[in-house]
Amino acid sequence: MPLEHRNMLVSALREAGLNAIDAGNFMRANLASFDMSWWRQQAPFILNNKRDFIAANIASWKALWSRGFAQAAEQRIKQSRYYQLYAEAGYDFLRPLEQKGVPLWRREEQFMVLGSDRPIPKLAEKLPWVRLSQRAFVTGTNEMNWRMFTRFVDKMYKVNERIAMGKITGKQAADWNMKRSIDSFARMIGDLTGRGELGPLKAISPGLNAGFFSLRTNLGRILTPRHLFAADPYTRKEAWKNLLAFVGGVTGVMLLGEQLGLWDVEKDPRNSDFMKIRAGGKRFDPWGGYQQYVTVISRLTTGEGVSATTGQEYPIQPFQTAGR
């Protein structure tokens, strides 16, 4: 095949592949435009950081109706005292508001379709509910994450001062490493809020995302437990505080509601409805994407699943279950 024809074929195949990816991401952006899905991303932090969550909701609501407010909120973060630290260290828990020219893997997965010059992304840009929802999503998550990050860095500077003044001594002072603590906490924010580190998987992220598989979110969910055993004691403490509040608070509300007869709660981890609220034929999952991994592990370890409709046990195929 002549080189010119070969290049034309490669270009056509590439364009067809991009159109398929764009179509999937277009559908996803529309689905994400009619709920408060950024709450799901922040779920592990909400109960232990209620003031930050309230402030983030206010910012998100204002950004929904005002592009100018959303842009100002982003600029306020970029002009704050710790943003240079954030940028130079290469942290990535903040989502870009304007996505044009931003690599696909850095964009918010729910709205990855925005920011390109191809036909489908251009159409998405013209849909007001997609644009408004993307602004609200990005502003809400960024506001909450930045508040938590700056408060932690402030705390680390205070620890550093106390060590310098001799108020903290012994092993705690000997093991002190401020950069390690901040790096570790930034990674924790990323993992727990759906910004898992992709590494060599960056190239395939857009394609998987088009198939409704959020690679960064799922990697973050899978990596979350590592922070409970982090080498840095300050990050480890924050991980335990936030995850205990998350699991304990959500479980308590669910079981209380069940006792009051408001809803039913499935307690068999082999069931896909495990620890979901069931009321009036509807299901509500407050776990932000974590529950499914408990179910998968339970099914893989027991070799059995339980039907969410009939309650009957059935044998499972390991590869099929892991794929779900």
Please give the residue ranges for each predicted region.
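Amphipathic interfacial helices
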Residues: 3-324
